[in-house]
Curated annotation (Swiss-Prot):
Cofactor requirements of the protein: pyridoxal 5'-phosphate
GO biological process: alpha-amino acid biosynthetic process; arginine catabolic process to glutamate; arginine catabolic process to succinate; ornithine catabolic process
Keywords, ordered alphabetically: Aminotransferase, Arginine metabolism, Pyridoxal phosphate, Transferase
Pathway per the UniProt entry: Amino-acid degradation; L-arginine degradation via AST pathway; L-glutamate and succinate from L-arginine: step 3/5
EC number(s) stated in the UniProt entry for this protein: 2.6.1.81
Signal sequence, renumbered to the chain: none
EC supergroup of this enzyme: transferase
One Pfam entry name: Aminotran_3
Protein name: Succinylornithine transaminase
């Protein structure tokens, strides 16, 4: 076989559409929570592919599941069903409130399906009913949310920087203030078909919802016959120390969307709901070519079975505290964080006023010392590592973060 031609970081700028600005190194290999670049430099991974690699890189059981299914059948199309998709659906149903599942390929697709379902259910059940003033097709979302990059989901996201250049945008979407129940109550009416919310706003700064806020949304949706949609793309599949974050709050949604960690690095998305609401979608009303393919579902089934274990989920909560304790020590030395927030292994370090706007600079500096981390806006350094990252890796990774912080501090104070 012919050897592949050499590529460099410059190749990205030459050949790819510039929708991203990746780091100046190229990762070529990963094992557990360690990555290596083309030059052989190692990095501890606190990013996890943005909350995707929940079991790290190259987990032997996940790899085995991929190889086993690859030797059978990869793809069939939606004219046929397959064993892995049926088994994965049953796993999700047994583990959650759901009774029905729709599989797709990404979080954006899952949210698109959820919003379409909400409008279709409202059309079927409330159109032209006595006492109904106006069409029941309005969607309430929240500012600084992130629900994907399709035109529908990016409009729901409530971040103009992602949507303002693509007008005209889909209508009928209204944005309230996250964690402000009065704001939501003002927007949710009998014309509302759905409320979509993240239990923790990830891209919006790792901001957890208040328990009272989510319970209040549940009550408002019940009062106005609107579907409550929980976007758990980033918080799902063990990320917060429960299989799904709604389980912390004692409130169940009508629809839940999942992706990212569900495949452990293999693309897959899912929309979970009840029989009552799923009945709104009939044959041909929605679909996707690759959704529910046997290769993705075989991998996801293994990932889910490994993560949905009491010991592993308890370990996520323990690791959260390890992070918090080490970060407190870093902050005692450098005084850069105003707040550390999040749940489980979705953690946001909010920079104080002196270091406002420098999250990207800190992450880039830390990479020089061998740490891969994330940002959640200009003022928040974000971590979403493997759920089974070791105590040693946490300690070493945060030591590398501290070196990056010290480098930035010297610039700020000099």
């Amino acid at each position: 076989m012919e050897q592949p031609s050499p590529v460099t970081r410059q190749s990205f700028d030459e050949w790819l559409v510039p929708t991203y600005a990746p780091a100046d190194f190229i990762v070529v290999r990963g094992e557990g929570s360690t990555l290596w670049d083309q030059q052989g430099k190692s990095y501890i991974d606190f990013a996890g592919g943005i909350a995707v690699n929940a079991l790290g890189h190259g987990h032997p059981a996940v790899r085995a599941a991929l190889i086993e299914q690859a030797d059978k059948v990869w793809h069939l199309g939606n004219g046929y069903t397959n064993e892995p998709v049926l088994r994965l659906a049953k796993q999700l149903i047994d583990a959650t409130f759901a009774e029905k599942v729709f599989f797709c390929n990404s979080g954006a697709e899952a949210n698109e399906a959820a919003l379409k379902l909400a409008r279709k259910y409202a059309l079927d059940n409330f159109a032209n009913k006595a006492g109904q003033q106006g069409e029941k097709n309005q969607i309430v979302a929240f500012r600084n949310a992130f629900h994907g990059r399709t035109l529908f989901t990016v409009s729901a996201g409530g971040q103009p920087k992602y949507s303002q250049d693509f007008a005209p945008l889909p209508g009928g979407i209204h944005h309230g203030i996250f964690n402000d129940l009065a704001s939501a109550e003002h927007l949710i009416t009998d014309q509302t078909c759905a409320v979509i919310v993240e239990p923790i706003q990830g891209e919006g700064g790792v901001l957890p919802a208040d328990k009272e806020f989510l319970h209040g949304l549940r009550a408002l949706c019940d009062r106005h016959n609107a579907l409550l949609i929980f976007d758990e793309i980033q918080t799902g599949v063990g990320r917060t120390g429960e299989l799904y974050a709604y389980m912390h709050y004692g409130v169940s949604p009508d629809v839940l969307t999942s992706a990212k960690a569900l495949g452990g690095g293999f693309p897959i998305g899912a929309m979970l709901t009840t029989t009552k609401y799923a009945s709104a979608l009939s044959v041909g009303s929605h679909g996707t070519t690759f959704g529910g393919n046997p290769l993705a579902c075989a991998v996801a089934g293994t990932v889910l079975s490994l993560i949905n274990q009491p010991t592993l989920l308890a370990g996520v909560k323990a690791r959260h505290q390890w992070f918090i304790d080490e970060l407190a020590e870093i902050n005692a030395r450098h005084n850069v964080f105003a707040e550390i927030r999040g749940r489980g292994l979705l953690i946001g370090c909010v920079l104080n006023a002196q270091y406002a706007g420098k999250s990207k600079e800190i992450v880039q500096a830390a990479a020089q010392y061998g740490l891969i981390a994330l940002i959640a806006g200009p003022d928040v350094v974000r971590f979403a590592p493997s759920l089974i990252i070791s105590p040693k890796e946490i300690k070493e990774g945060l030591a590398r973060l501290a070196m990056g912080i010290e480098q930035v501090c010297q610039k700020v104070t000099s």
